Amino acid sequence: MKLIPFLSEEEIQKLQEAEANSSKEQKKTAEQIEAIYTSAQNILVSASAGSGKTFVMAERILDQLARGVEISQLFISTFTVKAATELKERLEKKISKKIQETDDVDLKQHLGRQLADLPNAAIGTMDSFTQKFLGKHGYLLDIAPNFRILQNQSEQLILENEVFHEVFEAHYQGKQKETFSHLLKNFAGRGKDERGLRQQVYKIYDFLQSTSNPQKWLSESFLKGFEKADFTSEKEKLTEQIKQALWDLESFFRYHLDNDAKEFAKAAYLENVQLILDEIGSLNQESDSQAYQAVLARVVAISKEKNGRALTNASRKADLKPLADAYNEERKTQFAKLGQLSDQIAILDYQERYHGDTWKLAKTFQSFMSDFVEAYRQRKRQENAFEFADISHYTIEILENFPQVRESYQERFHEVMVDEYQDTNHIQERMLELLSNGHNRFMVGDIKQSIYRFRQADPQIFNEKFQRYAQNPQEGRLIILKENFRSSSEVLSATNDVFERLMDQEVGEINYDNKHQLVFANTKLTPNPDNKAAFLLYDKDDTGEEEESQTETKLTGEMRLVIKEILKLHQEKGVAFKEIALLTSSRSRNDQILLALSEYGIPVKTDGEQNNYLQSLEVQVMLDTLRVIHNPLQDYALVALMKSPMFGFDEDELARLSLQKAEDKVHENLYEKLVNAQKMASSQKGLIHTALAEKLKQFMDILASWRLYAKTHSLYDLIWKIYNDRFYYDYVGALPNGPARQANLYALALRADQFEKSNFKGLSRFIRMIDQVLEAQHDLASVAVAPPKDAVELMTIHKSKGLEFPYVFILNMDQDFNKQDSMSEVILSRQNGLGVKYIAKMETGAVEDHYPKTIKLSIPSLTYRQNEEELQLASYSEQMRLLYVAMTRAEKKLYLVGKGSREKLESKEYPAAKNGKLNSNTRLQARNFQDWLWAISKVFTKDKLNFSYRFIGEDQLTREAIGELETKSPLQDSSQADNRQSDTIKEALEMLKEVEVYNTLHRAAIELPSVQTPSQIKKFYEPVMDMEGVEIAGQGQSVGKKISFDLPDFSTKEKVTGAEIGSATHELMQRIDLSQQLTLASLTETLKQVQTSQAVRDKINLDKILAFFDTVLGQEILANTDHLYREQPFSMLKRDQKSQEDFVVRGILDGYLLYENKIVLFDYKTDRYDEPSQLVDRYRGQLALYEEALSRAYSIENIEKYLILLGKDEVQVVKV
């Protein structure tokens, strides 16, 4: 097909005019059309939340394909695998539709080829592209194509630790061991070992992994801050700050003397006020920095006289108290600023004095880091296992050093497209530059939604292009999508009101002006005053709680407020639970949130990443069991195992056993005492009674058998032996939240199996890996279990990005920002390099013996202070963007929920606004989201803000005021039905009383069971069923049926029945994670989770399962997982025509897709068959019952029914 020319500027303008004048209900905006059709230059699309950026990308791709571009000529990078899958699905539908609509034969054929090539298109994450690239071109760097990815954090940690200790030993024993020893001591802290240094090394390594060339950055930028340090300039800046602070203080005191001070004539503090004014008055234009510093020192000294009371207005007159309080508050603020400046003078002096020593330390650190980076790189090459960042580095290395490879890709790609460009890091940006020909990049993103700085994403990459393209269109085209098609006008107005007053270039990194403001465009949502954004505050005054306490009472007060609103939405407005989302900035309070919701019976599902897997009780018990098997001399682990439900020793029994003597008096341990207790049991019956002796013998025998088994079997087999020997897996399943506990135990076995497949063998190394993960204060992700279908969503703001919910609650608005990075011993900057705290040893000059002769002083280097300021601004900017993402998730209504003392909050005063923004100090002194919202509410009281705050006290949050969750009946989700089992039991008891009466009156009906499964009904009715003249399977002679003369199998190997295979296949289909890409490897891992024997697993053909998902029905299921229901139980009342009795039909539907006006029902069958019609006939009646149950439940008549036949070598999907 010939390439059709792209649209000119004039043609695009005509298209925009035609669209504006069209009668379409939902029109494309002029900017969307511009973004879809503009070509032949670099394009940056700044797409605000809800502006349809995915639609624009898909339309642009479709337009290019329709003009003759091949799908293989497009490089399309998405931020997540899920986003790539969704884009492919959207393109598949659009291309298919275009094929149907066009009459052009050439275009049909061309688009048909693109549709066929779509699965192989370069649409995916950067990581997926680099993996394929290195697999193809890695030979250029001597990298084997069968490399693997170090996705397991624990395996990565083991490798890092091993390499660290190798490099550490080399430096510690090397020529520069004295300077290295100084470096080691600088980070040793209280531990006085290498852990402090190791922590900083790993932190710097993670930072380096986001640079395009780690070694180059280390050599060129790591010491840049030391090289350009200018203390003269810093002193001048500090002097200017001192001048300004002294002038501010002078202005404040003079205003006070001229006004309020007249009310306090002859008050003692006024003399000291005048004294300070005289000191400041001694300064003039000729005064140098020394003079200013001297005045500052005298002023600060006066402010500290009499513990600060020298300048305090101590008036106790009731009518003058507000004036006195206001003066004292401002005075404290002014002198706190002066005190900080006084400290900075001293710090700057120390920084200059120890600059040379700190630089020397930094050079030693640079040398160590360089060796570590190279050693770790080589070690990973030996293992042929890499992190994703390594793959990217090698890809860049090949593209930079092999021009023929780079040019082939630049010629191949007609356009290089990237989604979520605001979250790009420097290594990704370099790769995009190398793949592009310089003028064919299409970048879509929104800097206001850049929230991944902790992953080294740099929003300034986006911002730099935004500014450059805006100022010089020749550099590239800037297109701004402002219209929001997602949210109500109430949500958008509240969001604009907040960020117009909060975000600017100084704090926020962008000016929130008309280029960034959200514009309402969802014409389907009409304005509704009830949807005005609500800023809800739990009033702590009612409970008298302390400001900083984090008690459960306080949190449940806030949660009760939320629960009240949820119940109101659900019960008064009919809002489904799944339409409500609870967003948090972190998961630290999730346990208490979940507890509060469960107390009121509100179903909830989390984002599945609690990261507290190793803290779960059942996993801790198993880890202690493994520790004891490895080394029984560990007392803590041994006691934990003995007290666990597996053996159940109580305190009395353990005390009796611990009173035994040990062989080793110096290092006595419990295990030796147990051995001795076993030997001496017969002679110490008073201490070791018979029952205890038998219990101890059983424990020691089982432990010995496990230890022996561990020597000859895999970890996976050992763990399952423990589960089976002591029925531990079954035991935890009977506990509250049993399925989740069992899933955790499953995961432990699987993780042990993965560990041993990663070139690490043995129980010892597995335990050491777990201990290292715990020591590093990391954890493994918790295992997700099937969530309820209709449930409130609880997730972090990061996880909510890209999602939307009708009603959004932003919780914990009062939770303080995480500032751990700014308290670290090391702060890095891409521009300045290393900032470090130097530990200086100083002579005290003390003569007396009881005074220390030397002290250690922690001195932040000049670069550290500069990096700290840069980090503070970047952190506050990111927090603003995080709040923006959270607020723009809401479609209809937004709730911002916090807590605080009403009295304290309402008494707070703030500086006046400047240029329509909060004062920069107000913004930078905020500790949390709530501080910003409250300050806006107070400073802009005259503005008609589109959100309102409201305090809610304890009197409004009693159990009666909140209410209860009303129970409802029609076809409930099984998770909610479980909450009402007590009602079912009561009904059952009432029915049992009448059993005898029913038996007497309805004897004829007794032959028909009252509760049946569809298969039972089929068997019961087979003699009389008439399925439109079709013969019932199993009746009469089967035509053409082959007769088998095979000898019976008398072998001793395990027999596998068809029922076992069928049951295992059904469980496998239920467990498959459809959100991930399906591969043979992923199915193999899922199969391991199926509760069956290995013999049955061996009989399941995974290729056939994989083939099913390539069928039309399989693809429809993958594309519509939001509509998918699997393994759904149902019950239905039917009447037997012979006895005229009602009976209940119960069963489990394999799965169905629920659409608005249609249901697609499917059922898996593993029966053997000759012709599909045999199984269609056999199961037609069963599917008819399923159809009837669904039709009754959802009032939908249009139901398609499919049998998925897995009984032959090839899968068949048959419509019934």
Curated annotation (Swiss-Prot):
Self-association state and partner proteins as the record states: Heterodimer of RexA (AddA) and RexB.
Gene that specifies this protein: rexA
Highest classification ranks of the organism: Bacteria, Bacillati, Bacillota, Bacilli, Lactobacillales
Keyword annotations: ATP-binding, DNA damage, DNA repair, DNA-binding, Exonuclease, Helicase, Hydrolase, Isomerase, Nuclease, Nucleotide-binding
Name assigned to this protein: Exonuclease/helicase subunit RexA
Function: Involved in DNA double-strand break repair. Is not involved in recombination during natural competence or in plasmid establishment. The heterodimer acts as both an ATP-dependent DNA helicase and an ATP-dependent, dual-direction single-stranded exonuclease. Recognizes the chi site generating a DNA molecule suitable for the initiation of homologous recombination. The RexA (AddA) nuclease domain is required for chi fragment generation; this subunit has the helicase and 3' -> 5' nuclease activities.
GO molecular function annotations of the record: 3'-5' DNA helicase activity; 3'-5' exonuclease activity; ATP binding; ATP hydrolysis activity; double-stranded DNA binding
A Pfam family that the UniProt record links to this protein: UvrD_C
Signal sequence, start to end: none
Needed cofactors: Mg(2+)
Record organism: Streptococcus pneumoniae serotype 4 (strain ATCC BAA-334 / TIGR4)
